[in-house]
Amino acid sequence: MSKTTFDAQSITNSLRAAKHQPRKRFGQNFLHDRSVIREIVESIRLERDDNLIEIGPGMGALTEPLLAEVDAMTVVELDRDLADSLRIRIGANSHPNFEIIKNNAMHVDYRELYSDERGKLRVVGNLPYNISTPILFHLLSYADVIEDMHFMLQKEVVERITADVGSKTYGRLSVIMQYHCHTDYLLTVPRGAFNPPPKVTSAVFRLTPHIIKPVVAEDEEYFALVVRETFNHRRKTLRAIFKKSTLLPTLSEDDFAACAIDPQARPETLSVKDFVNLSNQARKVEG
């Protein structure tokens, strides 16, 4: 692991040297706790030939210890000041296979970073909390070229992504993410591990895209619509939701029976498989 020191003071000094102020619109909170950094890197279990992509490297607190574990690495950084600072500090001279993409993570075509030679992508990052969900959904569209993803987000969002069916935190994000990926909650990160400290506690989690989905929706866009619309009315029964919704068809008792779902059930009691069966039946009714 890199011997570079990252602590609150060194982060502050580096920001001053780069004449950079953390930008709220980019959701910039810089990780500095070395024990947390070590734990994150170890949890990823990297191999030398991994095709590693880091989103939002910031000051490089994770970048350098990650780079010490692999032969090549690409980072995506929107903030040009930080990207330039990384290029100067790490540079192509000491790491010829280190590439910086100055771009919004939402605008990157991740398929271009994949090749048979380089292999599937292993994506990591401390995502900007204010746009984390859109980035996750963008990455899901490249799931076929991604081996796994390790991200740090607000703890409450990670709890929703990894929630078990029937729990209070189980919802739309749980169903959609678990439809596409296996999810693992890895570790909790306290506010003090960052400079400046965020207002919320963070957590690290893993997403591993299914090579073969356990269940397959006949129309994935419609499946997402059913999940979204039902959880928008999570206190109502499924019968009531489908009866009153302007976006979904009314389902009969036979329709619910066809997918082995109780019409009196509420959305949080349905598994991913239940939602797939429900959306397939609703799509059939709608024609």
Swiss-Prot record:
Residues 1-20 are annotated as: Disordered. It is found in: Cytoplasm. Belongs to the class I-like SAM-binding methyltransferase superfamily. rRNA adenine N(6)-methyltransferase family. RsmA subfamily. Its main location: cytoplasm. HAMAP family: 16SrRNA_methyltr_A. The lineage of its organism: Bacteria, Pseudomonadati, Pseudomonadota, Gammaproteobacteria, Moraxellales. Keywords: Cytoplasm, Methyltransferase, RNA-binding, rRNA processing, S-adenosyl-L-methionine, Transferase. It is an enzyme of class 2 (transferase). Pfam families: RrnaAD (PF00398). Its EC number is 2.1.1.182. Specifically dimethylates two adjacent adenosines (A1518 and A1519) in the loop of a conserved hairpin near the 3'-end of 16S rRNA in the 30S particle. May play a critical role in biogenesis of 30S subunits. S-adenosyl-L-methionine binds at N29, L31, G56, E77, N126. The keyword Transferase applies. SMART domains: rADc (SM00650). It catalyses: adenosine(1518)/adenosine(1519) in 16S rRNA + 4 S-adenosyl-L-methionine = N(6)-dimethyladenosine(1518)/N(6)-dimethyladenosine(1519) in 16S rRNA + 4 S-adenosyl-L-homocysteine + 4 H(+). This is Ribosomal RNA small subunit methyltransferase A. GO terms for molecular function: 16S rRNA (adenine(1518)-N(6)/adenine(1519)-N(6))-dimethyltransferase activity; RNA binding. Residues 1-15 have a biased composition (Polar residues). GO terms for cellular component: cytosol.
